[in-house]
């Protein structure tokens, strides 16, 4: 018996995978945006951090792996070659999203550190992120949860 779960065999289920992405993509942006706007409307939102975290350096290039999860999210469906596997994968992603958004709504936490100014390609990526993201999703880390599933 293999320790790795079977992804199924055969062809990529394009229709089913794209259908799930057509549901999960908009759901992500709508629910995530809703949670952020609700937290912003609260006014004062707490932060949770340790003093030693101020010593962690800011590396602008880390925006690239951060953004890469969006690509990996979509590509992850190409590894699912059975209907049951596609559905299970999509439901795991949906569950992580629901849990994170519920936490963001119930216990919003604001990022306490201001990002330094960044220019060039990395600056453009940070600007694109800032166009739809607000600092009210400190915990749980939805990116890490999705990355573990992917």
Regions found by a protein language model. Give the residues of each.
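Membrane-interface loops
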Residues: 36-52, 80-150
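Hydrophobic alpha-helical transmembrane segments
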Residues: 63-76, 91, 146-149
């Amino acid at each position: 018996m293999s320790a790795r779960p079977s992804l199924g065999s055969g062809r990529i289920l394009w229709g089913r995978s794209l259908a799930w992405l057509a549901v999960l993509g908009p759901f992500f942006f709508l629910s995530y945006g809703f949670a952020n706007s609700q937290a912003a409307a609260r006014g004062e939102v707490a932060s949770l951090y340790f003093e030693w975290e101020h010593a962690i350096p800011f590396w602008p290039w880390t925006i690239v792996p951060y953004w890469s999860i969006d690509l990996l999210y979509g590509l992850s469906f190409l590894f699912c070659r059975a209907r049951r596997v596609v559905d299970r994968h999509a439901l795991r992603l949906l569950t992580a999203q629901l849990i994170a958004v519920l936490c963001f709504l119930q216990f919003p936490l604001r990022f306490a550190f201001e990002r330094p100014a960044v220019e060039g390609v990395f600056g453009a990526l940070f600007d694109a992120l800032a166009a739809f993201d607000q600092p009210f999703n400190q915990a749980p880390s939805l990116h890490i949860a999705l990355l573990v599933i992917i």
